[in-house]
Amino acid sequence: MQIPNRLQPFYENLVFERHDNQMVINFGPQHPSAHGQLRLILELEGEKVTRAVPDVGYLHRGMEKMGENMIYNEFIPTTDRMDYIAASSNNHAFALTVEKLLGIEVPRRAKVIRMMIVELNRIISHLFWLATHALDVGAMSIFLYCFREREFAMDLMEDYCGARLTHSSIRIGGVPLDLPAGWLEKLKSFLEKMPENIALYEGLLSENRIWKMRLENVGIITPEMAKSWGCSGVALRGSGIQWDLRKEQPYELYDEVEFDIPVSDSGDSYGRYKLYMEEMRQTVKILHQLIEMYPSTSSEIMAHAPQYISAPKEQIMTQNYSLMQHFVLVTQGMRPPVGEVYCATESPKGELGFFIRSEGEPYPYRLKIRAPSFYHTGILQDLLPGGYIADVVTIIGNLNIVFGEIDR
């Protein structure tokens, strides 16, 4: 038996031309501005970047393979660890995919609560992005202001599900809990302050000379680049392409709420910053409408599908059949029909999608995750050359990547 040769890391095959004034350096994988375990191999001429090669994989945990060895419900807490800044968005996309495979309809109240949770996560994610991006560029005050508001939003998540970061707040078939007493009033109070806070952030940054010098005409993504690299979210809309899955392929109740999709034609980092600010305003608008919709919905928060979904807790505690059914679903898992589905949502960072191939077993035969940050990291090899070494940190931070969903 012939022993196979050791697999060679891809960078061992890279060839860099040697000439005067040329330098090859490593950026990361341990770097405070890498926003995770990112390694960049940069070729420089003076302070100009002439070549950039992203190297990912330092945070790889085999999530897709883990999902293929877990029953469907068990995988939900694992999705929290992908984009851990907006954990509920991951729960939501996975739950929608399984529900599409099962062919079940979620109760209206559960849809309203889900939308509240994921839109609140969008604000949390955008505030975290602005805080860390501004800190990378050298603005300290905005970091403190953003984390102040983010703390209120995280308190709301903790009041609902008991967790601040990894929420596991959405279930296949609905949501585990109705909104606690007084929660809507707290949310309304938070939303009433957000327009003033967003105006404060813009007042500190939008006309700041240093901020504009660091972001304007830096990291320009053309429409052709955005489409060829598979960009989505703000990275795509910042290049003049109006595409948001909440509008183009509505899910839950997004076709019943009014909101605008901000678009910028500049393609640069400053244009993307302005989009993030406007997106927070639109999210506040959506949440106000959801607060008005909530009281008119029935109290049901889980789908009625005994073959796949456990009965309400009251029935499990009082009826033998419901208890036995719950025991089977928890220990052995549901058995979806044979087939394959893909479902995507508009997460805070772009299009987050799950592909599931089912063979009728309690475990997926194949689970594939389409994470937006993976594509936004790949584009760095086209985006960084031609700029300065000082712009590398600006561009990485501006693209809003998170490595939990890249190395999956």
Swiss-Prot record:
It is a peripheral membrane protein. Keywords: Cell inner membrane, Cell membrane, Membrane, NAD, Quinone, Translocase, Transport, Ubiquinone. One of its GO terms (molecular function) is NADH:ubiquinone reductase (non-electrogenic) activity. Belongs to the complex I 49 kDa subunit family. It catalyses: a quinone + NADH + 5 H(+)(in) = a quinol + NAD(+) + 4 H(+)(out). The keyword Membrane applies. GO terms for cellular component: plasma membrane. Gene3D superfamilies: Cytochrome-c3 Hydrogenase, chain B (1.10.645.10). NDH-1 is composed of 14 different subunits. Subunits NuoB, C, D, E, F, and G constitute the peripheral sector of the complex. It is an enzyme of class 7 (translocase). It holds the Pfam family Complex1_49kDa. This is NADH-quinone oxidoreductase subunit D. The keyword Transferase does not apply. It comes from Wolinella succinogenes (strain ATCC 29543 / DSM 1740 / CCUG 13145 / JCM 31913 / LMG 7466 / NCTC 11488 / FDC 602W) (Vibrio succinogenes). InterPro entries: NADH_Q_OxRdtase_suD, NDH1_su_D/H, NiFe-Hase_large. It comes from the Bacteria.
